[in-house]
């Protein structure tokens, strides 16, 4: 179910403050965050945000095509290595 249009998109306050501060200084640096639920808004375009995936922070460069998506969509948490190999030969 999508978020109601009456409400604004969710962005963590600490993340929003860091973005605004960097925009006023016109500086670019990596912003570290654990807030995977935050929505990408147009003021974040051009920044690099390191998003936590449960083990490490993955740096993601924000482009205009990412606006409206959540930060967590761009840092995968599970590394699928394939199904277990069939070992019927070893059982015989």
Swiss-Prot record:
Single GO cellular component term: mitochondrial small ribosomal subunit
Keywords, sorted A to Z: Chloroplast, Plastid, Ribonucleoprotein, Ribosomal protein, RNA-binding, rRNA-binding
GO biological process, any: translation
Subcellular location: Plastid, Chloroplast
GO MF term set: rRNA binding; structural constituent of ribosome
Pfam families xrefs: Ribosomal_S19 (PF00203)
Keyword field contains Plastid: yes
Cited SUPFAM superfamilies: Ribosomal protein S19 (SSF54570)
Function according to Swiss-Prot or TrEMBL: Protein S19 forms a complex with S13 that binds strongly to the 16S ribosomal RNA.
Protein name per Swiss-Prot or TrEMBL: Small ribosomal subunit protein uS19c
UniProt source species: Eucalyptus globulus subsp. globulus
Biological classification of the source: Eukaryota, Viridiplantae, Streptophyta, Embryophyta, Tracheophyta
